Amino acid sequence: MLDIVLYQPEIPPNTGNIIRLCANTGYRLHLIEPLGFEWDDKRVKRAGLDYHEFAEVKRWPNFEAFLEAVAPTRVFACTTKGRTAHSAVQFAAGDALLFGPESRGLPIEIIESLPFEQRLRIPMLPQSRSMNLANAVAVFVYESWRQLGYAGSLQE
């Protein structure tokens, strides 16, 4: 499976929804601190319902600690600043999908540290700025999982 990495997420219900998404797909969730909310915020739990126990969630003090411990094969910056469509890449087990905080996106230093082909975006109309974080994560997760044949799902 792949790893979902939320860099300094700010909105508890988004993180809760992503926890539920990970529980349903088997993807692992990594949260890069500082979080913009308390981990025990009831809005995180409410959005994730009773799926928290079925999701693998880890917190990291910084992005470097995540990279060192997990050592993903490739890291993809999922950003409005990307040039490659999310569906134009062949994902593989061991990849990590990195998303920035809701209000400001990923730091430019992180984006620029990755090769151009690993800076991905979801196609949108020109007048649109961005998508909701939980929705964007779901788009990436289901595209990558589709490419992997929905490994581990009930459809197998």
Swiss-Prot record:
EC class: transferase
GO terms for biological process, alphabetical: wobble position cytosine ribose methylation; wobble position uridine ribose methylation
Keywords, alphabetical: Cytoplasm, Methyltransferase, S-adenosyl-L-methionine, Transferase, tRNA processing
EC assignment: 2.1.1.207
GO cellular component: cytoplasm
Subcellular location: Cytoplasm
Known function: Methylates the ribose at the nucleotide 34 wobble position in the two leucyl isoacceptors tRNA(Leu)(CmAA) and tRNA(Leu)(cmnm5UmAA). Catalyzes the methyl transfer from S-adenosyl-L-methionine to the 2'-OH of the wobble nucleotide.
The protein, known as: tRNA (cytidine(34)-2'-O)-methyltransferase
Species of origin: Aeromonas hydrophila subsp. hydrophila (strain ATCC 7966 / DSM 30187 / BCRC 13018 / CCUG 14551 / JCM 1027 / KCTC 2358 / NCIMB 9240 / NCTC 8049)
